Curated annotation (Swiss-Prot):
Gene3D superfamilies: Aspartate Aminotransferase, domain 1, Type I PLP-dependent aspartate aminotransferase-like (Major domain). The gene is spt. Pyridoxal 5'-phosphate binds at G113, F114, H213, T241, S243. It is a peripheral membrane protein. This is Serine palmitoyltransferase. PROSITE patterns: AA_TRANSFER_CLASS_2. Homodimer. NCBIfam families: SerpalmtaseCFB. It comes from the Bacteria. Catalyzes the condensation of L-serine with palmitoyl-CoA (hexadecanoyl-CoA) to produce 3-oxosphinganine. Exhibits a broad substrate specificity concerning the chain length and the degree of unsaturation of acyl-CoA. One of its GO terms (cellular component) is plasma membrane. Its cofactor is pyridoxal 5'-phosphate. Belongs to the class-II pyridoxal-phosphate-dependent aminotransferase family.
Length: 399
């Protein structure tokens, strides 16, 4: 594209070209196998420590069978939005089971997790309203807030004093919504929900929690952040995704029945998007059943997390304040982060680089994520290789 200012903007985007020239490009890496603890890349075995499949259910034969059965019964797609011809009986069944799971009156499905934040934020709030966001909230929360045309205010990461100060300066009679990640996707720490909800009640603000990385990980039977703290009644909206612990694709929002009914008829990402495919719905239903009936998956996830965290700390890795299976290993240099990611893949370990602008350059890191299905031998092998690569890269954060 070479037309005018748009062409100029495109031509100035050089980072991909520069990384490829250095052999450090680490995105869109094609995987030739199932998303499991070991994957195949370029025909080679690679240990997978970059997946969000926390419970390792993407390869569960019962879930695969449920998806196959749904394909036979309903076909490959719904050919319309939920608002019109795209609602199946299994959509309704899943909504009912999800709302009961997270302790809310009702739920509405979205075709992706990203849309699950876009929809509520963009239609519930308006020009004279205020949305308060943690500065480390997911991009979908930020974009949904922008689409609402409301006044967006960011507070310091998990900084409740800053949140209180910013709420105190807002008009008392204004509509206010605090939206936060439950488990933060880059750092792995958990929101201080007890203090946040206390402040919200003090200032008459609603609360929405993004449980994308919390479902299947924390809370009673993996029911998420509000359940983890026993604060279901203090959280107005719970958002979750199916692409992580629930081994599928899509998302949902749960809350009071009247709010969900409002979303069904006003959230554009429901009304103008084709509905979740039958196979995705059926696989989510089966995964939800497994999570609720087989606690050993979550127990094993946490055993692996505790084991890996202890081993990494013993070797001197900087893990920040993580409290979850997301282990951020800080490198604090964009270029070294890319170099470490590439060298680890060459050595058979897949991790995800997190660099600016996703985080400040001085907080760049690799994200090392655990699955319930990892073995201790796999964890040991990956850490041994990381120690070697970090030393080769002269990463200063390695003690």
């Amino acid at each position: 594209m070479s037309k005018g200012k748009l062409g100029e903007k495109i031509s100035q985007f050089k980072i991909v070209e520069e990384l490829k020239a250095k052999g450090l490009y680490a995105y869109f890496r094609p995987i030739q196998s199932k998303q499991d603890t070991e994957v195949k890349i370029d025909g080679r075995r690679v240990l997978m420590f970059g997946s969000n499949s926390y419970l390792g259910l993407t390869t569960d034969t019962r879930i695969i069978k449920a998806a196959q059965d749904a394909l036979e019964k309903y076909g490959t797609g719904c050919a319309g939005s939920r608002f019109l011809n795209g609602t199946l009986d299994i959509h309704v069944e899943l909504e009912e089971k999800l709302s009961a799971y997270v302790g809310k009156e009702a739920a509405i499905l979205f075709s992706t997790g990203f849309q699950s934040n876009l929809g509520p934020l963009s239609c519930l709030m308006g020009r004279n309203d205020y949305i308060l966001l943690d500065e480390r909230d997911h991009a979908s929360i930020i974009d949904g807030s922008r689409l609402s045309f409301s006044k967006v205010i960011k507070y310091g990461h998990n900084n409740m004093e800053d949140l209180r100060a910013k709420l105190s300066r807002l008009p008392e009679d204004s509509a206010k919504l605090i939206c936060t990640d439950g488990i933060f996707s880059m750092e792995g720490d958990i929101v201080n929900l007890p203090e946040l909800t206390s402040i919200a009640n003090e200032f008459d603000a609603a609360v929405m929690v993004d449980d994308a990385h919390s479902l299947g990980v924390i809370g009673h039977k993996g029911a998420g952040t509000a359940s983890h703290f026993g604060l279901n009644d203090d959280v107005d909206l719970i958002m979750g995704t199916f692409s992580k612990s629930l081994a599928s694709l899509g998302g949902f929002v749960a809350g009071d029945a009247d709010v969900i009914d409002f979303l069904k008829h006003n959230a554009r990402s429901v009304m103008f998007s084709a509905s979740m495919t039958p196979a995705s719905v059926a696989s989510t239903l089966k995964a939800l059943e497994i999570i609720q009936n087989e606690p050993e998956h979550i127990e094993k996830l946490w055993k692996n997390t505790d084991y890996a965290k202890a081993q990494l700390l013993d070797h001197g890795f900087d893990l920040g304040a993580t409290e979850s299976p997301i282990l951020p290993i800080f490198i604090r240099s964009n270029e070294k982060t890319f170099w470490v990611t590439k060298m680890l893949q060459d050595d058979g370990v897949f991790v995800n680089p997190v660099v600016s602008p996703a985080v400040p350059a001085e907080e760049s890191l690799i994200r090392f994520s655990l699955m319930a299905t990892h073995t201790y031998d796999q964890i040991d092998e990956a850490i041994e290789k990381m120690v070697k690569v970090f030393k080769q890269a002269e990463v200063e954060t390695l003690i």
